Amino acid sequence: MPRTPEQYEEIRNGKRQLIINVALELFANQGYSSTSISQIAEKANMSKGLLYNYFKSKEELLHAIISKSITGMMRMIDPNNDNIISDEEALDFFDLFFSTMKNNTVEMKNYFQLTFQPEVLKLLAEGYTTKRDSKYAEMFINFFEKRSPKNARLKILNLISTLKGFSMQYVFAPEFFSDELVDAYKEYLKNVFIRGTNE
């Protein structure tokens, strides 16, 4: 029985995701510059020609990895896609972020190892900011300006630095953090950044 267009699309999406996952692992552990398209294709168990049907270059593949991470983050913060962050969505975001951190430690660890490589940082600085990213930044600014008009950008910087710093500690050494401690810290951050209390 021939496959339907939907089935072909599902297969294609599956292979695309496989390539992204394999590339992230190799970029993180071998280095972006030291990893070749041939190595990615071999580990993904496909030919270079097939891989090039999905990604035209290694840089395009890197962009897909970064874009996937940003998209996943924004689905957490604006699930109804209305470009407005409500208080409820902001509180839910912390639950989703911490759940993702605890359930995807290897992927998040690989992502950190990738994005802190000098050559990757250079590529990010040279033009990976898109209109979509600017829209997301504006959403955060609007959310925090309602709470602290004078310090909205500082609040955003503090939030991003806090989440990145803690998640890095967690994914590289999760054995040092009990579930009780992580949950308590999550609620503390909700209080500080969303509810406006320090308790």
Where are the regions a protein language model picked out?
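Hydrophobic alpha-helical connector segments
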Residues: 64, 78-105, 146, 156-159, ...
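Short, basic, alpha-helical segments at the C-terminal edge of helix-turn-helix-like DNA-binding modules
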Residues: 67-73
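C-terminal peripheral helix-coil segments that are non-catalytic and often amphipathic
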Residues: 1-2, 99, 134-150, 172-199
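Short hydrophobic clusters on alpha-helical segments that form packing/core surfaces
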Residues: 15, 19-27, 97, 163
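Amphipathic alpha-helical packing segments from all-alpha helical-bundle domains
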Residues: 79, 103, 120-147, 153-157, ...
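Helix-turn-helix
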Residues: 18, 26-60, 64
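N-terminal intrinsically disordered/low-complexity leader segments
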Residues: 1-14, 199
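Amphipathic alpha-helical segments used for helix-helix packing
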Residues: 89, 100-127, 171-175
